[in-house]
């Protein structure tokens, strides 16, 4: 698994129209966030901070059991760090999902949760936790249908109210399942 370094640098690539993370040794990671959702600080070069490294490690630990390849786990963890640090505040879009739990459910950052609707069930990681809602990111490789014409892709973020979420429990090292 890729280990964080204090030599890593965030920068915005105008030609690619994307936030990038220079990992050194001619390796560059392209963040999966569109230009329009980035805070102003994303457009200035800055170091991968101690907080970034801590968040990266936390996300890596929480996704270790997911049935993803190591490169996909790194991609997911780095996109989570980028969203946590550089994504503009967003309003919840809970109407896409069914209510699954009482209003008292409060997921933790890094927790993998389940969201359901009439079209299926998706698995998401909590990127940033707020009082009643959280920004989460799709961890499934397959697209998740929000409605018949709108789909989410791997690593795409969305903010959802906590009552739409259900906790996940590891069944074994290769699979995960909903509990509740």
Swiss-Prot record:
<comment type="function">
    <text>Contributes to the efficiency of the cell division process by stabilizing the polymeric form of the cell division protein FtsZ. Acts by promoting interactions between FtsZ protofilaments and suppressing the GTPase activity of FtsZ.</text>
</comment>
<comment type="similarity">
    <text>Belongs to the ZapC family.</text>
</comment>
<comment type="subunit">
    <text>Interacts directly with FtsZ.</text>
</comment>
<dbReference type="InterPro" id="IPR009809">
    <property type="entry name" value="ZapC"/>
</dbReference>
<dbReference type="GO" id="GO:0043093">
    <property type="term" value="P:FtsZ-dependent cytokinesis"/>
</dbReference>
<dbReference type="InterPro" id="IPR048373">
    <property type="entry name" value="ZapC_N"/>
</dbReference>
<protein>
    <recommendedName>
        <fullName>Cell division protein ZapC</fullName>
    </recommendedName>
</protein>
<dbReference type="Pfam" id="PF21083">
    <property type="entry name" value="ZapC_N"/>
</dbReference>
<dbReference type="InterPro" id="IPR048372">
    <property type="entry name" value="ZapC_C"/>
</dbReference>
<dbReference type="Pfam" id="PF07126">
    <property type="entry name" value="ZapC_C"/>
</dbReference>
<dbReference type="GO" id="GO:0005737">
    <property type="term" value="C:cytoplasm"/>
</dbReference>
<keyword id="KW-0132">Cell division</keyword>
<keyword id="KW-0131">Cell cycle</keyword>
<keyword id="KW-0717">Septation</keyword>
<dbReference type="GO" id="GO:0000917">
    <property type="term" value="P:division septum assembly"/>
</dbReference>
<keyword id="KW-0963">Cytoplasm</keyword>
